[in-house]
Amino acid sequence: MSTDAQQDSRDSRDGRDGRDGSGNQDFQDWQRWHEERIVAVAAPHGPLSLTGTHWLSDYPDGRIPAVPGQWRTGRDEVVLTGAPEDGLTVDGKPLAGEAGLTADRGPIGSSRVARGERRLVLLSREGQWAVREFDPHSPARHDFRTIDATPYDARWSLEGTFRPYDTARTVRVANADGRERGLGLGGEIAFTLDGTEHTLQAAVEPDGSLWAVFADATSGNSSYRFRFLRPGAPDEDGRVKVDFNRALLPPCAFADHFICPFPPPGNTLTAAVAAGERNRIDA
């Protein structure tokens, strides 16, 4: 790693104008969140370490260049065939023969298939299988310096209301890899900014929290082309905190091989959201 992540994040506070609430608990909580984000992104198997997403439909013979083993799709699994010279392990044990694999769900570092420090992670999207390769020695991880983020400003911590749809819906949206896929949506978040009501369509996560993909007037200019927002679970009356100070860069801001969805229709705000994470900064 080319720099100390926590020091970089502290340096980003230089020059704040006093409107950020730096003496209060909200700012301190945000600063801690920001520092933890930098550390997580820069982790050995964090998003910076992704060096490839290989769709098995592109390799009918199951042989992926520079990835050991043979990967063949079955009905509900992928069958990996390996020889001792491939250097593959499955569940920590050397692979010599076949192993049936399903999609990995846990942390990248605990994925079932490895080759030394590299992790080979199975991904399933709309019936298509892919192998993702995470390498702690990736050029992106080596070059990473910090995440550029706007210091906390209470103006961007808003009260919102979640309005669930009667029935969950799926819309087709372009993804960062150029393909179009379905994006599940469970409702919309309504909030008021400078006297104007705005809404964002959002997905509902298994734990009840929300997830929205949005763009705004800063996107592609002073910030990345789109960002994520992850509010907590609404209360029983639908009230939810909409804190743009914690707007996140999507994984594809850190590695080109992620397949992040673009914002769905209606999720491009006319306002300039000068808050949250803006861009990745490299050395």
Language-model segments: residues:
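Acidic/His-leaning functional-site neighborhoods
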Residues: E188-D235, N245
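Intrinsically disordered, low-complexity terminal tails and inter-domain linkers enriched
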Residues: T3-Q28
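Protease-labile, long low-complexity intrinsically disordered regions enriched in Pro/Ser/Thr
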Residues: G87-R132, P136
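Surface-exposed beta-loop interaction hotspot
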Residues: G116-L185, T192
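Extended, aromatic/histidine-rich regions of cofactor-dependent oxidoreductases associated
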Residues: R239, N245-A283
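Short strand-coil-strand connectors
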Residues: P65-V67, D91, A114-G116, T192-T196, ...
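Forkhead-associated
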Residues: L56-D104
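Extracellular/luminal recognition modules and glycoprotein regions
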Residues: E36, V41-D58, G62, V67-P68
